């Protein structure tokens, strides 16, 4: 399926479009399967989306929230993706705590915590070993270097094909991350990308040929739909 690429006039419009993307797909999942599953991204770009979601009247008891990656820090650390999403969104709505599925970071062993989260996903989605569950929606961001989730250029995480969760590495700091095959099983993947600093990476990602080891977001080719929401600064060079 060819990706959908929308270049929007500014970040505010990007967030408004993202809000519609999220709410319509989660509502559709609930109507079809009785619940909706979403995996969140970190960083600055999605924060206003999470704040907007906090103002929505959704059937929170039917929505399950996961994370696509997490810095290996405590939940009260300023860099925690879970902390950001809770403060901006999840703590503001009446979602059952059992529906919130953060990546564990307390074992002092990222490999152990990666396995723990993998086991949680396998149990929740009722999949056997070697099988990958299909999230209804995975939100992703993009780094200036072309990374997404915690899948960084030329790192071992890019070659993991038999796990749901692995350990990424950024400047010697471990992170937990969804693997490429898990992301690619999703029904919908939505990238949120803002800022002129992303232009070079986007050019390589959408080029006819480029090295995905250098620009890992090129590996993201889901079985479902792939949507890129870009603000004008990021997508300036991608306009037809």
UniProtKB/Swiss-Prot annotation:
Pathway: Carbohydrate degradation; pentose phosphate pathway; D-ribulose 5-phosphate from D-glucose 6-phosphate (oxidative stage): step 2/3. The keyword 4Fe-4S does not apply. Hydrolysis of 6-phosphogluconolactone to 6-phosphogluconate. It comes from the Bacteria. One of its GO terms (molecular function) is 6-phosphogluconolactonase activity. Its EC number is 3.1.1.31. Belongs to the glucosamine/galactosamine-6-phosphate isomerase family. 6-phosphogluconolactonase subfamily. It catalyses: 6-phospho-D-glucono-1,5-lactone + H2O = 6-phospho-D-gluconate + H(+). It holds the Pfam family Glucosamine_iso. This is 6-phosphogluconolactonase. PANTHER family: 6-PHOSPHOGLUCONOLACTONASE. InterPro entries: 6-phosphogluconolactonase_DevB, Glc/Gal-6P_isomerase, NagB/RpiA_transferase-like, PGLS. Keywords: Hydrolase. The gene is pgl. One of its GO terms (biological process) is carbohydrate metabolic process.
């Amino acid at each position: 399926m060819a990706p959908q690429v929308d270049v929007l006039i500014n970040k505010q419009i990007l967030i408004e479009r993202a809000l519609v993307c999220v709410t319509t797909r989660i509502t559709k999942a609930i109507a079809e399967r009785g619940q909706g599953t979403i995996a969140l991204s970190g960083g600055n770009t999605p924060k206003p989306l999470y704040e907007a979601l906090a103002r929505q009247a959704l059937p929170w008891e039917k929505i399950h929230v996961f994370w696509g990656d997490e810095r290996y820090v405590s939940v009260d650390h300023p860099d925690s993706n879970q902390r950001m999403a809770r403060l901006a969104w999840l703590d503001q709505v009446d979602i059952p705590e059992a529906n919130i599925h953060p990546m564990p970071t307390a074992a002092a062993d990222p490999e152990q915590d990666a396995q723990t989260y993998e086991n949680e996903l396998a149990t929740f989605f009722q999949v056997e070993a070697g099988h990958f569950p299909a999230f209804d929606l995975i939100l992703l961001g993009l780094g200036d270097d072309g990374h997404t989730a915690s899948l960084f250029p030329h790192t071992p995480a890019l070659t993991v094909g038999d796990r749901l969760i692995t350990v990424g590495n950024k400047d010697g700091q471990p992170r937990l991350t969804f693997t490429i095959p898990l992301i690619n099983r999703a029904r919908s993947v939505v990238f949120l990308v803002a800022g002129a600093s992303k232009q070079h990476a986007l050019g390589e990602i959408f080029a006819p040929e480029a090295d995905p080891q250098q620009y890992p977001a090129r590996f993201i080719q889901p079985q479902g739909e792939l949507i890129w929401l870009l603000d004008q600064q990021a997508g300036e060079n991608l306009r037809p």
